[in-house]
Amino acid sequence: MKLTRLLLFLAGCGLASAAQPNIVFILADDMGWNDPAFAGNCFIETPHLDRLAREGVVFSAACASAPNCAPTRACLLTGQYPPRHGVYTVVDDRHAPGSPHHRLLAAESREALPAESVTLAEALRPKGYATAIFGMWNLGRGRTGPSTPVGQGFDVFVEPKQLGFEKDAYRDARGAYSPDVLTDAALKWVDTVKDRPFFLYLPFHDVHAPFDPKPELLEKYRGRPGTPDPALAATVEAMDRNVGRVLATLERLGLKEKTYVVFTSDNGGTRQYVAPLRGGKGTLYQGGLRVPALIRGPGLRPGVSNATTLSMDWFPTLLELTGTPTPEVDGRSLVPLLRDPAATLRRDVFWHFPCYIGGGGPCSAIRSGDWKLIEFFEGGRTELYDLSADPGELRDLASAEPKRAAELLAKLRAWQTSTGAPRPVEPNPAYDPKAEPNRGRENRGKGPKNPK
């Protein structure tokens, strides 16, 4: 199956040429929708991201394809919804189906990206692209095999562990800062492939907690009145500096005008940082889904698009921009929005999270226009929101708009059926109420009372 799909790519691909654009895809970890200054943050300085925003297209309503890291990474690399590839969450003992603190038997999640998946890197290689990932893969373990980066189309894979960093650590034994070292390695690689088209995937660990910020930046924000969290602010600015280093290298090598630079995050931020949105990472409320997103590159009309976009849309978008044949995928190309940011993108979009993680339980959601419906599998209840009037999702209109709620639920169920999405409705026989952690009322589909 995979060989057949790759042969189809080869049949439609010509030889690489100097005119083929490069791609630099920078992915933040847990960066909330309003952490960068270009998204409205008044406390954190992100001059390099702000420059990208001025020179490119910003997607002001961008959402992750999933509320946590692994599935979103699978979606952006394959252009598919989670039920297609089966990656729903990070697989570890805390979230294993049948855990005593789960009311329902959660769906099984793949630990690795299916070997038959065709990734963005695999699609680009027949066009003569050099491909590399420097950072977190999170879609399978090991360095060789069909589900590793090398098995999924990347010529080079450098993870923090290879550079002397423990898992999720910002610093090594010498005190070196992981994002800086990864950026050093990535830019050295760019120097070696500068004379051919390349795809650089740079998934940073920042801004995932717990933070270990640079002292001078931490001191800067501690001395700035009103900064909500100096450690987060310092970590965001440190990441922005590395973005600046990438941009400076592209300019030094004369590659700015032939390179698309994408920046986004894998999911929404933690709930204390996403106000006025509700929820956070691990939930299907807007706080868990909204992410910063932008692209700069040749032929784009700078501006702001208000269309609802998903992580999986980057796959067909970047293939179209590089003239690469695109297989049938769930994502939609955003190229029309890059030519005219005021253009519309009409479609229903879906999310499916049949697992437990942190504060979030199994649920599924649909957005159709301004309306969003969430189905919570615990208790079998739904919530309905008009995001145009209530972006914070405080007023559940399911009872006031029963017809609309029923129509959206029918669409959601039809989509679940068409994609083979698992519906975790079976009670967990091992459930122990005393073992249940305090997950918060809103993540069980029991949100706060509507304001008077």
What does each model-found stretch correspond to?
Residues A19-V24, E55-S60, K127-A132, Q152-D155, ...:
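Loop/turn elements at helix/coil->beta-strand transitions in domains of secreted/extracellular proteins
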Residues N41-A74, G79-R84, A130-A132, D155-F157, ...:
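Short, structured active-site-proximal loop/turn typified by the sulfatase FGly-forming signature C/S-X-P-X-R
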Residues N41-T46, A61-N68, A107-V118, D172-L182, ...:
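A short beta-strand-to-alpha-helix junction
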Residues T89-A130, W137-L200, F204-E216, R222-P225, ...:
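Formylglycine-dependent
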Residues G268-L284, L300-R301, A307-L387, S418-P422, ...:
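C-terminal cap/loop subdomain of S1 sulfatases and analogous C-terminal strand-loop tails that border
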